[in-house]
From Swiss-Prot:
One of its GO terms (biological process) is signal transduction. The chain crosses the membrane at residues 26-46, 58-78, 97-117, 138-158, 189-209, 287-307, 314-334. It holds the Pfam family 7tm_1. It comes from Homo sapiens. This is Probable G-protein coupled receptor 85. It is found in: Cell membrane; Endoplasmic reticulum. Its main location: membrane. Keywords: Cell membrane, Disulfide bond, Endoplasmic reticulum, G-protein coupled receptor, Glycoprotein, Membrane, Receptor, Transducer, Transmembrane, Transmembrane helix. The gene is GPR85. One of its GO terms (cellular component) is plasma membrane.
Amino acid sequence: MANYSHAADNILQNLSPLTAFLKLTSLGFIIGVSVVGNLLISILLVKDKTLHRAPYYFLLDLCCSDILRSAICFPFVFNSVKNGSTWTYGTLTCKVIAFLGVLSCFHTAFMLFCISVTRYLAIAHHRFYTKRLTFWTCLAVICMVWTLSVAMAFPPVLDVGTYSFIREEDQCTFQHRSFRANDSLGFMLLLALILLATQLVYLKLIFFVHDRRKMKPVQFVAAVSQNWTFHGPGASGQAAANWLAGFGRGPTPPTLLGIRQNANTTGRRRLLVLDEFKMEKRISRMFYIMTFLFLTLWGPYLVACYWRVFARGPVVPGGFLTAAVWMSFAQAGINPFVCIFSNRELRRCFSTTLLYCRKSRLPREPYCVI
């Protein structure tokens, strides 16, 4: 079959056996780790009902996208390297594989942006987040992201920003030409804009958390109390909160007349809001690490693409381009490690699932906290 690389590229020499071996070994490792890791995380998210919540629906969608890219697109890259950096499947197959690869890339970028917005809502507007971000809302967001990704990846199939086999990359993807005769620059600019917007949302979230942690000088105002209810201008509200939670004794405070006291609330219930806030921060940290790694691993490849579009002189060095392409491949298998090492809840559910599969769990002995 003909090679579909553009005529402006120089004819590459055949790869040395050592280079081909390193490429095949590393790519095979990436395929195995990505498929197995994302599949295990997906099974865990589906099986454990405690993880059927808004952030983990999005994580399941990211895992499915990475499995799609690793199981379908990467084997064709593997075969092209094995065949000496040549494409032997025809033009239509090349366009389909390139479409799936670009679809997965834009889907991950769009989804990470939507996740950053939901993370900000979870911490800054938690009540709105818990009421509005239901299963159907998450499903609508996921459908919207896939629709936008298809809209971005499909036009090159119709030769708008042509898909072709790039021999230097061993894959079918965008054919990047000079910016004066280029159709792919708009797609790259949009991808860079999405990544920048995602970072700005997380930056706003960091500023929000930092502002709430600032120490302010305390101004003491005397509170009014005849029966230890402490109401009035100087009251901090803690006595009223204790009374509502079922810890108050004596008559109803004057400011809480007509409000029923909750007598069934336990002492642990008082710390639920703080625990949820810490959990949301841990989940936000996990997704930010994913976003940062996506930007880090795709950054060199984006630099190489912009280099080919705007640079007039030398071409992109072969070693840099190969490393950039393989780093973008590695991004598909990095998320499972981030999930396990940065999320305590996922790690606990994962270990619990493995213990449940191996042996029956022993009942815990009763203990008393002194």
